[in-house]
Amino acid sequence: MHDILINWAPQETRVALIENGAVQELHLERTLERGLVGNIYLGKVARVLPGMQSAFIDIGLERAAFLHVADLHSTGFNPRANPDNTPPTPIEKQVFEGQTLTVQVVKDPIGTKGARLSTQVSIAGRMLVFLPQDNHIGISQKIGSAEARDQLRARMQTLVGKPEEGGGGGFILRTNAEEASDTELGDDIAYLRKTWAQIRQRSLAQPAGTLLHQDLSLVERVLRDLATEQTQSIRIDSKMQFDQLKAFGSVYTPTAVAKLEHYKGERPIFDLFGVEEEIARALARRVDLKSGGYLIVDQTEALTTVDVNTGGFVG
């Protein structure tokens, strides 16, 4: 069992997942530096690099983003149906400079490097992840037995329908879909398809470099991605965000709403539960070990180095 703490401020949101009194996960989002992962843009091919089998894509940001041929969806190459590892069609035969593409960010920019992109779009819902360019039904391995997964897959295939009948598309069932009714799954399917239809409609009406779809905020992703049956409580120290999250959860994650609590204490929520101290210890350059030795961790743009020192360890 675990608890989730949300510390909200106008400039920054921090989320800590606490299990057995220790911080197991820490998530941070700055208002002016929101992550781009999951965002969908209408991009324009700025340059094709055959030697690197990649292309630079202008998505309206300061630096051009990067698209590798392996992340380029095409009807002629499907990695899931490619057991022989047949190489994909060369990128210079698939895209050209000036071409517009609907792309999704899969990795945020770092240092001087632009964002990493994919044209294989995925849209996360409450119980499902929609893969509009695919026809695969995937089931989380965390869901029950093989028999339960097979039953869910059969139900989903019926609900999804056939492309020629207006259905189709690929879906991955998240862990919270295990106990979902057909009505709940059907509602999520309809919501995700509607979202994709709106994205496609915007892509036809907007110029290249336009943001077509933005992923949920960190506070909302707590309910979608972090809250599970193992969550005992979700405490948030902002009344405004508590009310907004409750309204959001009532529609998309009703089972998690009952676990929401507004923290009203005078002490900062992260201080009260010892999170600040754990953060400082985790981010320290030096990490002391029980044996008497210690680690020195340094991060550069290219790599992270870990220097192991014996210190007071004498065997």
Give the role of each language-model region.
Residues 1-315:
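DE-rich acidic low-complexity regions and acidic surface loops
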